[in-house]
Amino acid sequence: MSTIGRVTQFTVRNSTLENLQHNLSKMSTLQAQMSSGSKINSASDDPAATADVLRLQGEQRVLAQYGRNADDGEAWLTTVDTALQTSLASVRKARQLTINGGDGALGATSRIALAQEIEGIRDALLAQANTTYLDRPVFAGTSAGPAFTAGTYAYNGAPAGTVERTVASGTTIRVDSPGADVYGEGDDSIFKVLDDIAATLRADGDPTDQLDAIDGHVNKMLAEVSSVGARQNQVESAQSVISANHLTSTTRLSAIMDVDLAQIILDLGSQEVAYKGALSAAAKVLQPTLLDFLR
């Protein structure tokens, strides 16, 4: 034998109020999504999606750091390359002047003028060798001071201390240049070679004996230019990968978080209609009780 449950006015009232609250809550959620443009406004909205969002945002922070590292590395290498190209042009000019100085018909005045020009090139080369980026010498490793000392041409850099930038997980790129390898140091430096050429010109000697030494330094500079170019290509490749990964991450975040505004507007309109309908029904269901009349 079945029994029929007794439905009281209290039960009807509570059920109706719960339905109203549910509709109101859904409408509030839709309004929050529309105003923020995001499907997730608190972790409780979608715990699983929230975890994905936090992970993707963490990836984006890492990618942003890699991007800054790559941009900084690119600036370092561009500074190094510019200094090397300028130095190469100067050394090649010095080579031509050395050949000119080998002309036995040159008078003393011309030879002195050539010597002075050679010394000017030496000073310009020394300035290039002490080039800095953001007050950091680019040819001195991790040392803070000038790479070379004028006069003695001693190398002050830290050969074992290289400047590197991390552009991906497990990928670092050297962004400085070993000054001692490029310009030499002390008596073996290009600066000393130019000093000797200038002295020979003033002494009415033949400076072309130094051409082989000049060529040796040119070859060292060319080798470093090639190395820097290869590293610049690495940085550019890393920047492309970082940009692509950032775009992928942003797209995935958008798919998780971004709302379809047109759909939200439709849903909100439908929810408002449902809420008004529920209010109308509640007004009919929640009739005054005898106690209400007695009051």
Task: Name each model-derived stretch.
Residues 146-203:
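Cysteine-poor, low-complexity segments in flexible/peripheral regions
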Residues 1-144, 199-295:
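Amphipathic alpha-helical polymerization modules
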